[in-house]
Regions:
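Mid-domain Rossmann-like dinucleotide-binding core that forms the NAD(H)/NADP(H) cofactor-binding site
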Residues: 1-84
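Glycine-rich cofactor phosphate-binding loops and adjacent beta1-alpha1 units
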Residues: 22-25, 64-149, 214-215
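Structural detector of well-ordered beta-strand residues that form the stable sheet scaffold
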Residues: 31, 55, 122-124, 151, ...
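Conserved beta-strand scaffold positions in the cores of enzyme catalytic domains, especially
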Residues: 75, 150-152, 181, 185
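C-terminal hydrophobic helical "lid"/dimerization subdomain
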Residues: 81, 111-115, 157-215
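Residues in the short beta-alpha loop(s) of Rossmann-like NAD(P)-binding domains
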Residues: 60, 129, 156
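A local structural motif
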Residues: 51-52, 94, 175-180
Length: 215
């Protein structure tokens, strides 16, 4: 049940951000910005889609270590730190796809993410922004001249009736590692601890387990 619980939202959102909204193709270079639960699912989506280099970017060292275990080829603490290495590894082309799965998106960061997006590449915004914020900073000349794309994504562009059964089938076949994304399980009376661990970056995914005593 704990594996199925993750497939209600986080797994299809992340996986679909790479495979549907991002349409990652074999041989492409991909950056995943934020490798928590949704980002790790996006990372696995990029791996399964056949990405060549996968750059995991997250300020939490433990999450970067986990990302390498899930298939990332490189890991960095920030986009600024990653940019020079991405340019060197891709011979200046940068990333065909940039999947942004941070907890909260801010307009001031969009141009930074677009900066590691390749010519004619796509930056997918899966992380949510503030509904009251309308201050995206973007170099429009570079957007036009380099034909870059900025793509919003909800639920990874997934079809729940089709994709959730498919994801569970991939898990059963050993192609999608969902179980190892569950860092810790909590009782209902530990729910506040679970939220705090999430905010502190201690979990890839935490699961609240209900028992008969909770009814």
């Amino acid at each position: 049940f704990e594996v199925a619980a993750l497939c209600g939202c986080g797994i299809p959102t992340g996986y679909g951000s790479s495979t549907r909204s991002g349409d990652v193709r074999p041989g492409e270079d991909v950056a995943i910005v934020g490798v928590g639960g949704v980002g790790t699912a996006a990372l696995q989506g990029a791996v399964i889609a056949g990405a060549r280099n996968i750059f995991a970017i997250d300020p939490v060292e433990w999450k970067r270590e986990q990302a390498l275990k899930f298939g990332a080829t490189h890991a960095f603490a920030s986009v600024e730190e990653a940019a020079m290495s991405i340019a060197e590894i891709t011979h200046g082309h940068m990333c065909h796809k940039v999947i942004v799965t941070v907890g909260e998106v801010h307009g001031k960061d969009v141009d930074t993410w677009m900066g590691i997006t390749a010519k004619a590449g796509t930056c997918v915004l899966t992380g949510m922004g503030n509904m009251m914020e309308s201050d995206v900073t973007l170099n429009l000349a570079m957007l036009t001249l380099l034909q870059k794309n900025l793509q919003g994504s909800i639920f990874g562009g997934a079809n729940p009736k089709l994709d959730i059964p498919n994801l569970l089938s991939m898990y059963k076949l050993g192609k999608l590692n969902i179980a190892d994304m569950i860092t810790r399980q909590y009782r209902l009376d530990q729910i506040n601890e679970g939220y705090q661990d999430m905010l502190d970056g201690k979990n890839i995914r935490g699961v609240i387990r209900y028992t008969d005593e909770d009814h």
